Amino acid sequence: MKKQNTFLRLAVPVLLCGIIVVGCRLSGSRSGFTREERRILFEQDSILYVTVVTDPSDSLILRTPCADLSDKMLKSKDFRLFSEKLKATVQAPWEDGVGIAAPQVGISRRVICVQRFDKEGEPFEVYPNIRIDSLFGAVTLSTEGCLSVPDLRGYVPRREGAVISYTDPETLTRVSETVRDFTAVIFQHECDHLDGILYTDRADSVFFSERSAAERMYYDSLGYYVKPSVLIR
């Protein structure tokens, strides 16, 4: 999910996360991740390519319901790497998001990364096997954008609160939590991705954002949105 307010910026030097991969064997499956999923993780830099609806093969991924991760996967080094790369990707200046879901980087697993505006320091956190158990409160119109839907914004009806549950990757136990306000909106937006739903499916109206389009055009001219060969099918 894109930030609500974005501004065209000059080029910003980016200090990428220092993720160094040495001697990876992509043919192995000890982690539980598939060979294709591991290629996506290991054959790209710290910041992953984000799938977009304007690309036919990307759109198929975005519309595919996601599978849970096994306990084996959650305890693997591959999952830790995946988590770090999700955090790095959503915070990249040319993405500038507040949330991202696994299918947005080409991996159909129930994992999202959300910025917790309701916590001190507003950290980005990763939630595997996430579910929204219930929604509550009034329905309000949220102005939303999406990393995978370039140049557009929409007015989307969302509930003001949500009860979520997810698997703690350390203890492998289910955790339940209540979120409200803008944080709840982000969770609703990202969890929709895991079921193949885009905000445009729920929006009362969608409109072209000149600011978003100008920003994307600028970063596109610098080569930040080139699709890597590992995702070309």
Locations of the language-model features?
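Bacterial N-terminal signal peptides that target proteins for export
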Residues: 2-12
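Bacterial N-terminal signal peptides
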Residues: 11-21
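Positively charged
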Residues: 23-233
